[in-house]
A protein has these predicted regions:
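Non-catalytic regulatory/interaction regions at protein termini and inter-domain linkers
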Residues: 1-149
Length: 149
Protein backbone atom coordinates (compact mmCIF):
# COMPACT_ATOMS: atom_id res chain seq x y z
CA UNK A 1 0.00 0.00 0.00
CA UNK A 2 1.15 3.58 -0.60
CA UNK A 3 2.57 5.89 2.04
CA UNK A 4 0.27 8.14 4.01
CA UNK A 5 0.91 11.73 2.94
CA UNK A 6 0.27 14.54 5.42
CA UNK A 7 0.24 18.11 4.15
CA UNK A 8 -0.04 20.67 6.94
CA UNK A 9 -0.67 24.10 5.46
CA UNK A 10 -0.47 27.47 7.15
CA UNK A 11 -0.76 30.20 4.51
CA UNK A 12 -2.95 28.30 2.05
CA UNK A 13 -6.44 26.97 2.62
CA UNK A 14 -7.13 23.26 2.49
CA UNK A 15 -9.27 23.79 -0.62
CA UNK A 16 -6.48 25.68 -2.38
CA UNK A 17 -4.06 22.81 -1.67
CA UNK A 18 -6.57 20.38 -3.20
CA UNK A 19 -6.87 22.68 -6.22
CA UNK A 20 -3.07 22.95 -6.61
CA UNK A 21 -2.70 19.17 -6.44
CA UNK A 22 -5.34 18.72 -9.13
CA UNK A 23 -3.79 21.46 -11.27
CA UNK A 24 -0.41 19.70 -11.32
CA UNK A 25 -1.95 16.38 -12.35
CA UNK A 26 -2.87 14.55 -9.15
CA UNK A 27 -6.05 12.75 -10.13
CA UNK A 28 -8.99 12.05 -7.82
CA UNK A 29 -7.64 14.08 -4.90
CA UNK A 30 -10.84 13.62 -2.89
CA UNK A 31 -10.79 9.84 -3.30
CA UNK A 32 -7.15 9.78 -2.12
CA UNK A 33 -8.28 11.72 0.94
CA UNK A 34 -11.29 9.44 1.43
CA UNK A 35 -9.17 6.27 1.39
CA UNK A 36 -6.84 7.69 4.04
CA UNK A 37 -3.74 8.04 1.88
CA UNK A 38 -3.77 11.86 1.97
CA UNK A 39 -4.49 14.21 4.85
CA UNK A 40 -4.53 17.97 4.36
CA UNK A 41 -4.79 19.94 7.59
CA UNK A 42 -4.38 23.45 8.95
CA UNK A 43 -1.01 23.38 10.74
CA UNK A 44 -2.15 26.00 13.27
CA UNK A 45 -4.59 23.54 14.84
CA UNK A 46 -1.82 20.96 15.17
CA UNK A 47 0.51 23.30 17.07
CA UNK A 48 -1.98 25.24 19.17
CA UNK A 49 -2.63 24.91 22.06
CA UNK A 50 -0.28 21.88 22.29
CA UNK A 51 3.04 22.57 20.54
CA UNK A 52 3.64 18.81 20.33
CA UNK A 53 0.31 18.14 18.61
CA UNK A 54 1.95 17.69 15.21
CA UNK A 55 4.40 15.13 16.61
CA UNK A 56 1.49 13.23 18.17
CA UNK A 57 -0.45 13.28 14.89
CA UNK A 58 2.54 11.98 12.91
CA UNK A 59 3.16 9.23 15.49
CA UNK A 60 -0.51 8.18 15.24
CA UNK A 61 -0.35 8.15 11.44
CA UNK A 62 2.88 6.17 11.59
CA UNK A 63 1.26 3.52 13.77
CA UNK A 64 -1.74 3.41 11.43
CA UNK A 65 0.58 2.99 8.44
CA UNK A 66 2.31 0.09 10.18
CA UNK A 67 -1.01 -1.63 11.00
CA UNK A 68 -2.25 -1.17 7.42
CA UNK A 69 0.98 -2.49 5.89
CA UNK A 70 1.84 0.84 4.30
CA UNK A 71 5.37 1.98 3.51
CA UNK A 72 5.16 4.78 6.12
CA UNK A 73 4.27 8.45 6.40
CA UNK A 74 5.54 11.50 4.56
CA UNK A 75 4.79 14.75 6.39
CA UNK A 76 5.10 18.08 4.57
CA UNK A 77 4.61 20.75 7.20
CA UNK A 78 4.48 24.54 6.85
CA UNK A 79 6.25 26.04 9.87
CA UNK A 80 4.51 29.43 9.58
CA UNK A 81 2.94 29.00 13.02
CA UNK A 82 6.29 29.74 14.65
CA UNK A 83 6.48 33.11 12.88
CA UNK A 84 2.92 34.20 13.60
CA UNK A 85 3.67 36.41 16.59
CA UNK A 86 7.23 37.36 15.65
CA UNK A 87 10.03 38.05 18.06
CA UNK A 88 13.19 36.20 18.98
CA UNK A 89 11.38 34.04 21.51
CA UNK A 90 9.42 32.36 18.74
CA UNK A 91 12.61 31.74 16.75
CA UNK A 92 14.12 30.06 19.80
CA UNK A 93 10.97 27.96 20.21
CA UNK A 94 11.18 26.99 16.53
CA UNK A 95 14.84 25.99 16.79
CA UNK A 96 14.14 23.93 19.91
CA UNK A 97 11.20 22.26 18.19
CA UNK A 98 13.22 21.43 15.07
CA UNK A 99 16.09 20.14 17.21
CA UNK A 100 13.65 17.76 18.90
CA UNK A 101 12.80 16.14 15.55
CA UNK A 102 15.05 13.25 14.64
CA UNK A 103 16.44 13.40 11.08
CA UNK A 104 15.67 9.68 10.79
CA UNK A 105 13.02 7.83 12.73
CA UNK A 106 13.60 4.41 14.18
CA UNK A 107 10.77 2.00 13.46
CA UNK A 108 8.28 4.59 12.33
CA UNK A 109 9.44 5.07 8.74
CA UNK A 110 8.51 8.74 8.74
CA UNK A 111 9.93 11.20 6.24
CA UNK A 112 9.41 14.81 7.23
CA UNK A 113 9.82 18.09 5.41
CA UNK A 114 9.63 21.35 7.36
CA UNK A 115 8.68 24.12 4.93
CA UNK A 116 9.35 27.81 5.45
CA UNK A 117 7.96 30.81 3.60
CA UNK A 118 10.93 32.79 2.24
CA UNK A 119 9.81 35.94 4.01
CA UNK A 120 9.68 34.09 7.32
CA UNK A 121 13.00 32.33 6.84
CA UNK A 122 14.73 35.60 5.96
CA UNK A 123 13.79 37.03 9.38
CA UNK A 124 16.04 34.48 11.09
CA UNK A 125 19.61 35.42 11.96
CA UNK A 126 22.41 33.48 10.25
CA UNK A 127 23.25 31.56 13.42
CA UNK A 128 19.57 30.59 13.82
CA UNK A 129 19.47 29.30 10.23
CA UNK A 130 22.59 27.24 10.92
CA UNK A 131 20.99 25.77 14.03
CA UNK A 132 17.98 24.64 11.99
CA UNK A 133 20.11 22.47 9.72
CA UNK A 134 22.04 20.79 12.51
CA UNK A 135 22.03 17.09 13.35
CA UNK A 136 22.01 15.67 9.85
CA UNK A 137 19.15 17.78 8.50
CA UNK A 138 19.41 19.37 5.09
CA UNK A 139 18.18 22.68 3.71
CA UNK A 140 16.59 22.89 0.28
CA UNK A 141 16.06 26.48 -0.81
CA UNK A 142 13.33 26.82 -3.44
CA UNK A 143 13.19 30.42 -4.51
CA UNK A 144 10.95 30.34 -7.55
CA UNK A 145 7.83 28.50 -8.62
CA UNK A 146 7.41 27.53 -12.25
CA UNK A 147 3.88 26.20 -11.89
CA UNK A 148 1.45 27.88 -14.26
CA UNK A 149 -2.25 27.20 -14.52
Amino acid sequence: MPRIILIATFYETIDSIKHHLSAVGVQNVQSIIDNGSLLIIDSFSSYYPDIDGMKKLVATLSERARKEGRAGVTAIVDMGFFFMFGGDGRATELINYEASLAPKTEGYNVKGFSCYHGGNFSTLKDNQKKELVQKGKKLLDVTESTITY
